[in-house]
Amino acid sequence: MRNLSIDIESFSSINLSKSGCYRYVESPDFEILLFGYSLDGGAAQVVDLACGEKIPADVIAALTDEAVTKWAFNASFERVCLSRFIGLPTGEYIDPASWHCSMVWAATMGLPLSLEGVGAVLKLDKQKLTEGKDLIKYFCQPCAPTKAN
């Protein structure tokens, strides 16, 4: 394994946009719900952690293996979240040296800073699903109680 592409979906009662990544991850109820990955450009795999599935041991080992290049859109967020997931103490994080951020690469080319925006500008065949955004909001963000819920 030389390259590991990663995408996670997570939950925390802390508002990410108001509080930032570190406070979001430090919340006692923080959890990674879904872990999507691809090894060396192969087929994408999704591990449903919320339903008890486990990330393969070789993939967990690759997270801290400097010989494996990790790719993610907003890699800093994924790296900090995964640091907590693998049990590093608060304030200690996976070394960023072998991580590459496709959001930063997009920004250097003048592309939008959202995955949805990059896909639209580049007219990619596979776009981020708008339905997915609604589902992420429903499952990954706390909601205020209403009569309906």
Regions found by a protein language model. Name each.
Residues 30-32, 36-37, 41-149:
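Active-site-proximal helix-loop-helix substrate-binding element of RNase H-like nuclease domains
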